[in-house]
A protein has these predicted regions:
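Conserved acetyl-CoA-binding loop-helix of GNAT-fold acetyltransferases
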Residues: 76, 82-95, 118-122
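Conserved GNAT-fold acetyl-CoA-binding loop/helix
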Residues: 2-22
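Conserved acyl-donor/pantetheine-binding loop and adjacent beta-alpha core of acyl/acetyltransferases
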Residues: 46-73, 81
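C-terminal "cap" of GNAT-fold acetyltransferases
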Residues: 64-65, 122-123, 130-146
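Hydrophobic adenine-recognition pocket in adenosine-nucleotide-binding enzymes
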Residues: 74-76, 109
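Conserved beta-hairpin
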Residues: 31-48
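Conserved GNAT acetyl-CoA-binding A-motif
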Residues: 90, 97-109
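Conserved active-site alpha-helix within GNAT-family acetyltransferase domains
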Residues: 87, 99, 111-129
């Protein structure tokens, strides 16, 4: 995903983040989710309940003030790109949220991550404004089903 962002001309994830330590931390906190094919991990994301300090201050407005799941660090193995797997993961996340009676999903991405911007809009996420993440502004999105 880091190399794909670079080849797309995006500045997102070009500073050594995310790295193995970040993923290890996600897993130790039970935030990490994997998409597998057989015994091979082909996708990854972090899902965090109600805990993203950067989302407390938004230039704009969230759609809701209810509990939410933050979606971070979605990545697909290079040899599985173009198969709609990020969409599959987002659909699964929506189902997981519904099972937990959570109606709000939030995500952010760089202004130049065209693929993710397109997918979030395609999947019904609404642009809510800008948040500061790791020293830079990000476009913030929410999908609310309440």
């Amino acid at each position: 995903a880091i190399l794909r962002r670079k080849s797309d001309g995006s500045s997102q994830w070009q500073d050594g983040y995310p790295n193995e330590g970040v993923v290890d931390d996600d897993l130790s906190k039970q935030y990490g989710y994997v998409l597998v094919e057989g015994k091979t991990i082909i996708g990854y994301c972090a899902l965090i309940l109600n805990d993203e300090p950067a989302y407390k201050t938004i230039e704009g407005q969230w759609l809701s003030n209810e509990d939410f799941i933050v979606i971070h660090r979605i990545a697909i193995a290079p040899d599985h790109l173009g198969k709609g797997l990020v969409q599959t993961m987002l659909t699964y996340i929506e189902e997981l949220a519904k099972e937990q009676h959570i109606h709000s999903l939030r995500a952010d991405t760089n202004f130049d991550n065209a693929a993710m911007l397109h997918l979030l809009q395609k999947m019904g996420y609404h642009y809510c404004g800008e948040v500061m993440m790791r020293g830079g502004k990000r476009k913030a999105f929410e999908k609310y089903s309440g």
